[in-house]
Amino acid sequence: MEQYYGTGRRKEAVARVFLRPGNGKVTVNGQDFNEYFQGLVRAVAALEPLRAVDALGHFDAYITVRGGGKSGQIDAIKLGIARALVQYNPDYRAKLKPLGFLTRDARVVERKKYGKHKARRAPQYSKR
């Protein structure tokens, strides 16, 4: 059986996505998609690339994701799905690229600097 692979990263999260022709079953780390992301409204955003190319019920997705929090994992899955779809059909790139699904979000947490409380928060300044 043919399958298509895409890797997605976001913050500290890394998602490995395998798409196979099927009926729309999505499994994340061995659990059902809704079970893994239960109660998170944002989770549906991970499946947006499939909606964009009208392929929502046409593929089964087997996803392993590790690292980061749930939000970063959702965005990592989104990128992985988009890349796997382009592997399946290179013509999808024209639809997915303008919507930003093939762009890796490079924003990561800024490091804490010495002499500061956080990355930018400085100790309170007293004039006198």
Swiss-Prot record:
Provide any one GO MF term from the record: structural constituent of ribosome
BP term (GO), one? translation
Q: How does it assemble?
A: Part of the 30S ribosomal subunit. Contacts proteins S7 and S10.
Q: What function does this protein fulfil? A: Part of the top of the head of the 30S subunit. The C-terminal region penetrates the head emerging in the P-site where it contacts tRNA.
List where the protein spans the membrane. none
Q: Which GO terms describe its cellular component?
A: cytosolic small ribosomal subunit
Q: Which family does it belong to?
A: Belongs to the universal ribosomal protein uS9 family.
Keyword terms: Ribonucleoprotein, Ribosomal protein, RNA-binding, rRNA-binding, tRNA-binding
Protein's name according to its UniProt entry: Small ribosomal subunit protein uS9
